[in-house]
A protein has these predicted regions:
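Bacterial N-terminal signal peptides
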Residues: 5-16
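Structural recognition of alpha-helix starts/caps
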Residues: 2, 17-128
Length: 128
């Protein structure tokens, strides 16, 4: 009877082990936010013209300053960006990032065709 109990316990343990991924064994699975929740963009168009862009950045996430793109502005016109905080990235090297929020003012009157691009990452390792 004792041998049968040990045999069944070993079988159950091996089934549990077989169902575990070798890459996550003993680790807690990380849940990542969808991109629109990690980096929420709000656009305001003041009466005076131009636009105010505000990204709300979720805790544990950041945007790269160097990966922001503003297409559709008049030639030679670039928005003035806050300096950001220094960050060393293993792929991009020394960079600047934004955490919590980013506000960018576009002074040009006609921004109806503005196209935006950005890249950000989670501290836990997923990049968008």
């Amino acid at each position: 009877m004792r041998a049968l109990f040990i045999f069944l316990a070993c079988c159950l343990w091996s089934v549990q082990l077989a169902n575990a991924s070798p890459f996550t064994f003993g680790q807690k699975q990380q849940d990542f936010l969808p991109v629109d929740e990690a980096f929420t963009l709000h656009v305001e168009q003041p009466d005076a013209g131009g636009a105010v862009l505000r990204w709300d950045i979720a805790p544990g996430y950041y945007l790269y300053k160097e990966r922001l793109r503003f297409a559709g502005l008049p030639p030679g016109s670039e928005p003035v960006l806050p300096p950001g905080e220094p960050y060393h990235d293993e792929y991009f090297g020394d960079s600047r990032i934004y955490r919590d929020s980013l506000i960018v003012e576009i002074p040009e009157e006609d921004v109806s065709t503005l196209e935006l691009g950005w890249q950000g990452c989670a501290d836990a390792g997923l990049c968008y």
